[in-house]
Amino acid sequence: MKKLSNKVVFITGGNSGIGKACALKATAEGANVVIADLASADHEATLKELSALGGEHLFVPIDVGNPDSVKAAVAATVQRFGRLDIALNNAGIGGPYSGIHDMPDAVWQRIIDINLTGVFYCVKHELLQFLKQGGGVIVNMASLAGLKAEHGLAPYTAAKHGVLGLTQNIAVQYGEQHVRANAICPYYIETPLIHQAPEAVRLSWIAATPMKRLGQPDEVAKAFIYLASDDSSYCNGTQLILDGGVMC
């Protein structure tokens, strides 16, 4: 039996990388998937891949840093499918490596706006729908940087710590309303973005893991399915770490 049969799954940043892997895995598990991504994203190829696996799917444009855009994307999802069962708040950006003392204010603010405030905007409108319909599941994509400092990435680290705090607050405040919220904390995952890093840097990331490799998007997607499905029905307010043993 498929784990997400007929569930409506809303995924921000779902057109590439980890988000796309999660969308494909959710579709394979029987879900109807909404890809929420930048309007500039070339989403037709992704929708074709999803359709080949079955179900109904939708692309909605979103800028997670804009509350009106987030509200409209969630509304479009509900208008099409009549409900929202599962939300994966995955959209985010990296940032330049920088000291704190010489970091431009605009760089700090942009990363916080997208990686933390953007998650808040999504959670807010997802919760409004969940409360109307009697429950739902939220999975927030955090990072290992939400659990430990990442040298040179202060705003990213601060934002991901904030995402974990927000996730726990959702769990505490809305558990009685049949809302579950959990987070995934991956280490570096093999995505096109990762391959933009210099080879020496990538090798240093690999050397830091006891497994001597980086994670794969499909491995994150499997974790998402676990947290999204009834397999994790008593899991609430926790973090699932995918790091190959880095935190040991």
Language model: regions and residue ranges:
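Short, small/polar-rich loop/turn modules that mediate ligand/substrate recognition or access, typified
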Residues: G175, R180, C235-G237
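Residue(s) in the substrate-gating loop at a strand-loop-helix junction
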Residues: S143
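Active-site helix of classical SDR
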Residues: V123, A159, T167
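The beta1-alpha1 cofactor-binding region of Rossmann-like NAD(H)/NADP(H)-dependent oxidoreductases
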Residues: S40-A41, P61-A72, D105, D218-E219
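C-terminal substrate-recognition "lid" of short-chain dehydrogenase/reductases
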Residues: I11, G135, R213-L242, M247
